[in-house]
Amino acid sequence: MRILGLDPGSRITGVGIIEGERLIHAEGLVLGSGPLPARLGQIFERLQVIIETHKPTIAAVETVFMSRNAQSAIKLGQARGAAICAAVAAGLEIHEYAPRAIKQALVGRGGAAKEQVQHMVRILLKVDRDLGEDASDALAVALCHHHIAQTNRRLPPGVTLR
């Protein structure tokens, strides 16, 4: 199972692709500071190219966290929409995970610090270089889905974690 992890953002969108616990691709799509509709178009178009190149079979996306700034939350929701549309247009099944669930799956604590999650991503994928915050976050989402899918395969029929 090749998993596309997405950490959408209106300035930088994190992208990570894994197969099992093997790193296939990781990058932060820097979208610049142009008008929001142009940046949303970039997310869609650049993800289409990445999906076509690396052929993931499933997409895992971080859900929106509540922000005190309504405008930021709206922009984040729009970036998520562009990313999800690119994945759906490519025929990928979408799975969504809350930030606390991702931290729980990787670190064992839903309240883990971002640095702890990034450290676990590097350990699990056996990577000794800095992947960048956005790519690392996307890989964390992909690893979360991988771990949950593995666990669900071991459970009796009809029983799942989610």
Predicted features and spans:
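Phosphate- and other anionic-substrate recognition elements at nucleic-acid/protein interfaces
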Residues: M1-R162
